[in-house]
């Protein structure tokens, strides 16, 4: 989103605090701060954008929590990328299109799968430590809807935390990137010509600032906290989507919300702890209250069917009063603490030992597939 540095309506004539029209409101700002690019959000998308631009522009990253922020650090499962011997971007793309059930933009899927290996190599160069085998080669696991093992993990089930750590450290080292933590972006500011020329931000001390910039990047994550059952952290409340809508941006596919099939069914937990798909990739089975597998009757890939298929099958059973469990005793067993240390700790905190107990699971809101409509270069309608 961008328009140049022209002032918004009303800003130039203000005496004392400057009056700025943003979204559907008028704000009295205490300061005007200039940057070449403002990036709203400090998860993997926001931090990567800042690093890509930071060598050639003055970038200001704003996050309402700390660095890194959002769902990135909570992501257990890994990165799907066609880098394993015998794999290819074309095969990865075919699996992706199949899982999308006719809804994917195949041109964008092609970009995603072709650029994936290069982006992973960039993460490694920036310090991300992915799991490797005894010979030092990258270790790939298998997860749902993938025809082969192509998922990279870090520390077993702490992939997002490791990627976030590496990117945050790189951002802090970058001389032309500034970060405002614990600052809340209220609204986008539009110039008289109609484009976006910055954002109004509430700083930690409560004062308001107009971040004036010719380009604003929204990397604010999803809407998971709109749902009672979600795996998302508290800050994922759809702020970026809402401010884009107030500014008049085109939105798309808002109805597509992915529910992860296997969150820990812990009524006292908020958010619900995620039981990564990687556990099923290791061979764990979904079973009903009688200990019988049911996904083998639902889909040829059984537990590794696309997430919507698995989540729907579980939800149907829960709706009629049944319980569903993820049984990893045979597939992982005593190796659980080493293979999935984060999940093991979460389960134990709720009185479940996955080495000897089946894990009660339930679907939970996980990922917003829709959002602000953009083109192949990430440009919105504003």
Q: What are the language-model segments listed below?
A:
Residues 1-37, 55-56:
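Extreme N-terminal leader/targeting segments of oxidoreductases
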Residues 80-112:
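Glycine-rich active-site loop/strand segments that organize a redox cofactor
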Residues 124-207, 212, 219, 263-266:
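Conserved redox-cofactor binding core of oxidoreductases
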Residues 37-61:
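N-terminal Rossmann-like FAD-binding beta1-loop-alpha1 element of flavoenzymes
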Residues 243, 249-360:
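An anion/pyrophosphate-binding glycine-rich loop and adjacent beta-alpha core
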Residues 54-76, 85:
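Glycine-rich FAD pyrophosphate-binding loop
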């Amino acid at each position: 989103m961008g328009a140049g540095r022209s002032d918004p309506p009303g800003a130039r004539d203000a005496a004392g605090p400057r009056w700025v029209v943003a979204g559907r409101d008028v704000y009295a700002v205490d300061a005007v701060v200039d940057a070449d690019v403002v990036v709203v959000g400090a998860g993997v998308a926001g931090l990567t954008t800042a690093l890509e631009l930071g060598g050639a522009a003055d970038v200001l990253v704003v996050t309402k929590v700390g660095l890194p922020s959002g769902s990135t650090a909570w992501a257990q499962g890994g990165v799907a990328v066609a880098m394993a011997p015998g794999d290819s971007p074309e095969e990865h793309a075919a699996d992706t299109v199949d899982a999308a059930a006719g809804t994917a933009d195949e041109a964008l899927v092609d970009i995603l799968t072709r650029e994936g290996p290069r982006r992973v190599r960039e993460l490694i160069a920036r310090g991300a430590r992915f799991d490797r085998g005894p010979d030092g080669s990258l270790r790939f696991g298998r997860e749902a809807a993938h025809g082969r093992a192509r998922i990279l993990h870090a520390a077993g089930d702490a992939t997002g935390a490791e990627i976030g750590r590496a990117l945050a450290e790189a951002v802090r080292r970058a001389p032309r990137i500034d970060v405002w933590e614990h600052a809340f972006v209220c609204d986008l500011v539009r110039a008289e010509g109609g484009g976006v020329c910055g954002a109004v931000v509430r700083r930690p001390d409560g004062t308001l600032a107009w971040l004036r910039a010719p380009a604003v990047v929204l990397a604010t994550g999803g809407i998971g906290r709109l749902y009672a059952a979600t795996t998302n952290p508290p800050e994922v409340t759809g702020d970026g989507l809402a401010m884009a809508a107030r500014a008049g941006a085109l939105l798309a596919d808002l109805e597509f919300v992915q529910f992860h099939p296997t969150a820990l069914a812990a009524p006292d937990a908020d958010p619900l702890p995620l039981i990564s798909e990687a556990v099923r990739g290791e061979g764990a089975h979904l079973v009903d209250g009688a200990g019988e597998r049911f996904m083998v009757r639902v889909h040829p890939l059984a537990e590794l069917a696309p997430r919507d298929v698995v989540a729907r099958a579980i939800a149907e059973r829960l709706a009629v009063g049944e319980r569903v469990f993820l049984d990893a005793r045979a597939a992982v067993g005593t190796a659980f603490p080493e293979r999935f240390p984060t999940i093991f700790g979460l389960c134990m905190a709720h009185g479940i030992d996955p080495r000897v107990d089946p894990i009660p699971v339930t679907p939970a809101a996980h990922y917003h597939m829709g959002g602000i409509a953009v083109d192949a270069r990430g440009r919105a309608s504003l």
